[in-house]
Amino acid sequence: MTLTLLPAVDVADGLAVRLVQGEAGTETSYGDPREAALAWQRDGAEWIHLVDLDAAFGRGSNRDLIAEVVRSVDVAVELSGGIRDDDSLDAALATGAARVNIGTAALEDPEWVRKAIDRVGDRIAVGLDVRGTTLAARGWTREGGELYEVLARLDADGCARYVLTDVRRDGTLTGPNVELLRAVTAATTRPVVASGGVSSLEDLRVIATVPGVEGAIVGKALYAGAFTLPEALAVAAEVPAAGAP
C-alpha cells in the first residue's frame, strides 16, 4: 500500500484558513471550504482532513457548514474539532464522515473516550497534538498530559489509530518531526497518520519510510504552492508506505 495523503481543510468563521503553530489570530484565509474540498477531490484526493477550528477552540462551531462540506465531496473525510461528548460525536458521525478525530476529550475525559471507542470502533482516531513530549489540549492552548502515558492508556482502551501532530511544526513549512514519528510508532502497534510541517515532496518520501505511518496530512504546503496534490500523490505512489497494510 502507498502512503495515504489527506489534504487539510481547516474552517474558522465559515472560511477555509490555515494557522501557524495552531495559534488563533494567525489565520490566512483561502475562501469557501466547500470549494477547497472539491478542489482537492478534483486533484485526486481520496481522503480530506476537515477541521472545525472554532469548535476546537471552544468559541462556537461551523457544524452545518462542516456537514455541507462532507456532503459536497465523494471522497472519505476525516473530521476533527470539538468532539468531546456524545452529542458532538453523534453529530460528527451523522455528517457521513468516514472517521472522526477526538483530541481534548481523550486527555480530559478518558472514561467517555473509552466508551466511545467501544461503541464506534475504528471510526474513531485520537489526535495526539504534541509539544516536546507534552500533549496539547483545548485547541492547543493548554497542556494535556505526558504523551507516552496517554498513548499506553489509549492502546489499552482499543484505539484504532492516531493522528500525530507536532504543534511547533504545524503550518510552518519547516519539515516534519521524523524523530517524534519514529518514537511514537515504536511505542504502539496501531497505525499513525503524520501531521505538521510537511514542506516538500522529499518530506513525504521520508515520512513514507517510517514503519507504522500509514498517512500524512498536508495543509500549508499545498495552499502555499510548495507542490501540487497530483505531484504529492505521484510521490506517495512511488514510495510504498512502511506502515501501510
UniProtKB/Swiss-Prot annotation:
Its EC number is 5.3.1.16. GO terms for cellular component: cytoplasm. GO terms for molecular function: 1-(5-phosphoribosyl)-5-[(5-phosphoribosylamino)methylideneamino]imidazole-4-carboxamide isomerase activity; phosphoribosylanthranilate isomerase activity. Transmembrane segments: none annotated. The active site is at 10 (proton acceptor), 129 (proton donor). GO terms for biological process: L-histidine biosynthetic process; L-tryptophan biosynthetic process. It comes from the Bacteria. Keywords: Amino-acid biosynthesis, Cytoplasm, Histidine biosynthesis, Isomerase. It is an enzyme of class 5 (isomerase). Pfam families: His_biosynth. It is found in: Cytoplasm. Pathway: Amino-acid biosynthesis; L-histidine biosynthesis; L-histidine from 5-phospho-alpha-D-ribose 1-diphosphate: step 4/9. It catalyses: 1-(5-phospho-beta-D-ribosyl)-5-[(5-phospho-beta-D-ribosylamino)methylideneamino]imidazole-4-carboxamide = 5-[(5-phospho-1-deoxy-D-ribulos-1-ylimino)methylamino]-1-(5-phospho-beta-D-ribosyl)imidazole-4-carboxamide. Belongs to the HisA/HisF family. This is 1-(5-phosphoribosyl)-5-[(5-phosphoribosylamino)methylideneamino] imidazole-4-carboxamide isomerase. It comes from Parafrankia sp. (strain EAN1pec).
